[in-house]
């Protein structure tokens, strides 16, 4: 939030999980905190009784938020409630069609909480509830605002929606060095790969410290070099990985495509890794250079 504000963003910025030590900066940079417990509420009010915040309710995810039985005490603490900018909650399974009954139960409870708050405070509150999957699957409940998260990266919650979205990032690296590995030689930590024949391998300067899971070693995935797939060899290292380029015409310095929007998306890497695209994208290290391309 501070970086966005310092970069010239003037629109409201919601801080979803603030800590008590963050409150001074929240006030200084005019950020809007999520207030989710009485401990956080009381400490924030000790800093400012007028600064706007978003009040979060737990409707079934059982992560953060007040419960419906807390409304009376919230009223006693907040009085007119003029510093409540939004009421909100978070859906726990909006991407799963098999959990529609659960999700509709969350929505109904959120509506009940919102009405109880409005009746108690004698005012109508703005509300937000939906994440990307919620927008796609429960668009009738957008209320006053939505929280598009992974949708901004061009990913939805199923293949049909993904076809209509364009992933916004690619991840590339280069071949740092090429080695000829002889039969019976090993590659990588713990001798994770033993050559049963002669190989040519490429060393790529990206590893699990950058978000490339160690589970993707030993051929679990391949990366594109000069439009050919080079499977991983050996274990993924912290800062490097090795690939088989025996049958690929390439040289040191050639580009290696790790993630792209056509041949190998974050969704596909997530499927190979037995996880989701969220984990792949959020794991990408801040030490990797970002290049922003404007159309």
Describe the predicted segments one by one.
Residues 1-31, 35-44, 51, 137:
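N-terminal active-site wall of soluble small-molecule enzyme domains
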Residues 11, 31, 51, 82, ...:
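A structural micro-motif
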Residues 15, 175, 232-233:
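A structural signal for short, hydrophobic beta-strand segments that form beta-sheets
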Residues 18, 36-38, 57-59, 90-91, ...:
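Fold-independent oxyanion-binding glycine-rich loops
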Residues 20, 35-38, 65-68, 100, ...:
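Electropositive phosphate-/nucleotide-binding environments in soluble metabolic enzymes
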Residues 42, 46-52, 57-174, 181-182, ...:
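Active-site loop/helix belt of alpha/beta enzymes
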Residues 180-295:
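C-terminal accessory subdomain/extension
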């Amino acid at each position: 939030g501070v970086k966005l504000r310092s970069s010239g963003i003037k629109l409201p910025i919601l801080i979803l999980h603030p800590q008590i030590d963050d409150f001074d900066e929240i006030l200084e940079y005019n950020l809007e905190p999520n207030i989710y417990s009485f401990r956080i509420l009381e400490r924030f009010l000790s800093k400012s009784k007028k600064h706007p915040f978003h009040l979060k309710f737990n409707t079934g995810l059982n992560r953060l938020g007040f419960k419906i039985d807390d409304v009376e005490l919230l009223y006693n603490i907040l009085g007119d409630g003029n510093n409540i900018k939004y009421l909100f909650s978070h859906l726990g399974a909006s991407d799963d069609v098999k959990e529609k009954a659960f999700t509709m139960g969350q929505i109904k409870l959120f509506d009940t909480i919102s009405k109880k708050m409005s009746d108690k405070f004698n005012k109508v509150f703005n509300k937000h509830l939906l994440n990307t999957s919620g927008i796609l699957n429960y668009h009738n409940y957008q209320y006053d605002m939505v929280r598009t998260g992974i949708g901004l990266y061009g990913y939805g919650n199923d293949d049909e929606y993904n076809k209509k979205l364009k992933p916004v990032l690619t991840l590339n690296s280069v071949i740092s060095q090429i080695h000829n590995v002889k039969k019976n030689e090993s590659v990588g930590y713990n001798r994770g790969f033993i050559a049963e024949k002669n190989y040519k391998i490429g060393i790529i300067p990206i590893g699990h410290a950058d978000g490339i899971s160690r589970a993707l070693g030993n051929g679990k995935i391949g990366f594109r070099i000069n439009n050919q797939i080079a499977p991983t060899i050996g274990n993924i290292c912290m800062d490097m990985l090795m690939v088989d380029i025996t049958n690929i015409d390439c040289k040191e310095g050639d580009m290696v495509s790790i993630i792209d929007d056509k041949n190998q998306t974050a969704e596909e890497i997530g499927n190979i890794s037995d996880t989701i695209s969220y984990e792949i994208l959020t794991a990408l290290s801040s030490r990797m250079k970002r290049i922003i391309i404007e159309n």
